[in-house]
Amino acid sequence: MRRRLGTSIVCILAFSISLSVESMASESTDEAEEKGFKVVRTIPLEETSFTQGLEVMDGSIFQSSGLYGGSNLREIDLQSGNIIREMTINDSYFAEGITVLDQSIIMLTWKEERAFRIDISNFSIIENFSFEGEGWGICFNGEHLVMSNGTSQISFRDPETFEINHTIQITWDGQPVPNINELECVGMEILANIWLQDVILSIDSISGNVQYFISPASISSTQGTNSNDVLNGIAFDKSSGGFWITGKNWTHIYLIEISHQDTTSEIQETRGSNWFSAIFILSIIMLLILLSTFRNKNEPETPNFKGSTP
């Protein structure tokens, strides 16, 4: 009976340890890490823009600006911030996000359910696409056009037909993330702004999970005079490996490098402490097993009176 009870206790404790270890492993996988960043370069803009999209190509920044009656597409010099050329969009359209596709730019519109394909060489519209719902942000991952519509869903579209191939839901620590806005594709990673929030998310393009995030509040706090002048616009710079970011009606564009945040060490220390506790408890269990085995070997065998004859 004593041996059976000891075995049961050991099994229960071992099972508890396995659940604890599994929980810690799941926690380390699912939780989005906060990363830090540093500003390595700043470019003043010649004119402010109600920024909706941002792209870098061949030493220039391409920037789309929204608002009815004020929408446009600009090419901006990456050294001076001066406007090289500008294309005015029809007053009936509210321009949204942009992305480079081959030698053209795909531009979304907000509520008009229309996307334009614009020739980069002369800023002329060469093709139109229709889609259902609102258009917010867009990027090209080398295979699909990835598009947001202000919800927690993003769609992956055929670059030739603009038809939806599949959609995924964006989740942050298991919760859906609404208001996904400007997008930037870098390999299998998607960088995204959230409308009205000072945060940039890194999203896994397969699962939709947020992998890490940065909070550029230190930059946005120096920009804008009203609630609409929010962080919006992300462009990957292949030459530096950094990201250009800006916002609506901002006076500057910033090149940032993303790095690990010092505060993550606290999370790592906590997880390390949890692992140490698990190992310590497991060691105690092993010691109890050894002591129990040693005691059983040295105790005299108890006769089985039930089976003996009188």
Label every PLM stretch briefly:
Residues 77-81, 119-123, 159-162, 204-208, ...:
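Short loop/turn segments that connect beta-strands within beta-propeller blades
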Residues 28-48, 80-82:
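A short helix->beta-strand "capping" segment at the edge of beta-propeller domains
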Residues 40-72, 87-88, 92-99, 247-249:
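Beta-strand-rich domains and repeat architectures in extracellular enzymes and scaffolds
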Residues 1-29, 264-310:
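Secretory targeting signatures
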Residues 233-268:
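Blade-level signature of beta-propeller repeat domains, shared across WD40, Kelch, NHL, RCC1
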Residues 47-58, 91-101, 131-144, 148, ...:
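Beta-rich, blade/repeat-based domains predominating
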Residues 81-117, 125-135:
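Blade-loop segments of beta-propeller domains
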Residues 62-68, 105-112, 147-152, 192-196, ...:
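Conserved beta-strand positions in repeat-built beta-propeller and related beta-rich domains
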